[in-house]
């Protein structure tokens, strides 16, 4: 059995790590390189960096900090933010990232997923999906440009349809960012994760809502996700990664210590 992954998420804005609640009201959490080093030392399996305003600002992630992160950590890391071309991705991978993640640019140009997969291999291509449950319609909708509240828009895609389309085009991994739960610390959206898991044949990463060790366990055991991504509980020291991993192992979850 493959080990489940614990993945701190670092949202980057204006050169520092920030965290919001439901993608709004961001507060500064610390320096990019300092937090990356800390999480690697604490035993994180992987890191994900989102330059959250790159797509809405029509620019590419700042590559200067990518190379600095690569110099100080020895675990895989993924970078996202305004990657719109093979060349954008090539530069980020050359600066030391192990994977690139695309979200809004893939919605604008789904063929980008295929071009990246053909050039770098599916193992390097992650598709992030910002999913919002619309209580009025009862549908899970995909949102775009979520890094800037004023520019966020609802796309025509239902989440399950976009998950399947992204895989068909070459996504090697899906990160499901559940907007309703983001920063609330009330648990992952297990119902939605189970629905996505049923149609997702590539590794699936849960994101949005972790607030207790039980939430990680439930995502792994009840929704069968491959990795669990979290931010505020790690940034604020509410759940130490070494303790989390020991606890999960005692709960029978296959985890790297």
From Swiss-Prot:
Enzymatic class: lyase
Coarse class of the protein's main subcellular location: cytoplasm
Highest taxon of source: Bacteria
Catalytic reactions on record: 5-[(5-phospho-1-deoxy-D-ribulos-1-ylimino)methylamino]-1-(5-phospho-beta-D-ribosyl)imidazole-4-carboxamide + L-glutamine = D-erythro-1-(imidazol-4-yl)glycerol 3-phosphate + 5-amino-1-(5-phospho-beta-D-ribosyl)imidazole-4-carboxamide + L-glutamate + H(+)
Keywords, ordered alphabetically: Amino-acid biosynthesis, Cytoplasm, Histidine biosynthesis, Lyase
Residues the record marks as active site: 11, 130
Subcellular location: Cytoplasm
Enzyme Commission number: 4.3.2.10
A GO biological process held by the record: L-histidine biosynthetic process
Gene Ontology CC: one annotated term: cytoplasm
Pfam families: His_biosynth (PF00977)
Molecular functions (GO terms): imidazoleglycerol-phosphate synthase activity; lyase activity
CDD domains for this protein: HisF (cd04731)
InterPro entries documented for this protein: Aldolase_TIM (IPR013785), His_biosynth (IPR006062), HisF (IPR004651), IGPS_HisA/HisF (IPR050064), RibuloseP-bd_barrel (IPR011060)
Pathway field: Amino-acid biosynthesis; L-histidine biosynthesis; L-histidine from 5-phospho-alpha-D-ribose 1-diphosphate: step 5/9
Subunit structure: Heterodimer of HisH and HisF.
Function, in words: IGPS catalyzes the conversion of PRFAR and glutamine to IGP, AICAR and glutamate. The HisF subunit catalyzes the cyclization activity that produces IGP and AICAR from PRFAR using the ammonia provided by the HisH subunit.
Family: Belongs to the HisA/HisF family.
Name the UniProt record assigns to this protein: Imidazole glycerol phosphate synthase subunit HisF
Organism of provenance: Aeromonas salmonicida (strain A449)
Species lineage: Bacteria, Pseudomonadati, Pseudomonadota, Gammaproteobacteria, Aeromonadales
